[in-house]
Amino acid sequence: MTTLAAATKRLLSRLHDPTVAVDTEFIVAPTSMEEAAEILGAATAVGQAVAFYGAGTHRQIGNPVDADLVITTTAMNRIIDYQPDDLTVAVEAGVTLGELEAALTDRNLTAVLPETEPNATVGGVVAAGRSGYRRLRYGPTRDRILQATAATGYGKVVTGGSPVVKASTGYGMPRLLTGSFGTLGLIGPVLLKLWSQPRAAATVVVDDAEVARNVAYRPLAVLGTGGNARVYLGGTMEEVDAQVEAIGGRSSDGLDWPEPHDPPLRLSFRIPARFVDEAVVAARDLDATDWVAQYGVGIVEAGYDRITSDGFSAARAWAESVGGTLVVEASPNDLRRKLGAWGSPPDSVELQREVKDRFDPAGICNPGILPGGI
């Protein structure tokens, strides 16, 4: 063993985390971004492929990665700076959504992250580019990340963005990191824009989601499920009552989100919003056991016990023909390799490669997880 390799092994052994169950020799939990950068620099020097792990809730999305080393964020789980008057909070990547939302209740605030994933980590949600159902009202997660820090593949800690709330719709590193699946490095602390929880909220069960969406004024979400369609409303009591009356249907107080499911196979149709109804038909034609359709957003997530290759190929071809894609979000690795996690690479794939090369020139960070083998 070379001196460099021996030093790397000592570094990784010092930070070993035995609590994370993944199939690789080294699992390490740095306590700071500087330690993470040191690990990544050492991994680059000896040519080790690195994967990243938060709570493991999004590990089955993307092409399978054969990693020599896994870096976890379990030891970086602090709420660093909470400024409720400024509507911002800075958190480390290992903080779970449940922990974050619990800390915001004292001032009736929310980070508007996925509502049904309390065990997911902030870093994992950002890396996977996940947004909650309230995206219809508040926009995607990337629009609420004001500032972000990452440890790059070349072993440096970099920060981008601005702590000023008005910069939340700008461009830069926060947007590059969102949905990057760790291909640019380990996502660390992020500064999030917060929103006030509505004073009143209601869930309205309706017959036709699209018709109800056109009647509702700025609903939080409009969802179709295997059982019914629901409109989610938030605002003052007067606003909510008026909308409930205008929409009709059966209403209840509060936000009754769909129960999360954990099927052996989960697919996500990501299509222009006008094709949601057609995507629901495509999902059902594949014998979905459950589904949630996000009207006005263009996402239909569906669970399956099994699927045929021909049926899947036809569904993916349809999704791509209308300008979308069909993503395998959960499945055994061998099936994901057979079906292909993403489908056809996007037109921006070469630009993505250039960005990857800037942050991770040795290509060690989650190699091959993204479309086109990035």
Where is each model-derived feature located?
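N-terminal accessory segments
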Residues: 1-26, 42-57, 315-343
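Conserved glycine-rich FAD pyrophosphate-binding loop
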Residues: 61-68, 74, 117, 156, ...
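Terminal amphipathic helices with adjacent charged low-complexity linkers/tails
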Residues: 232-253
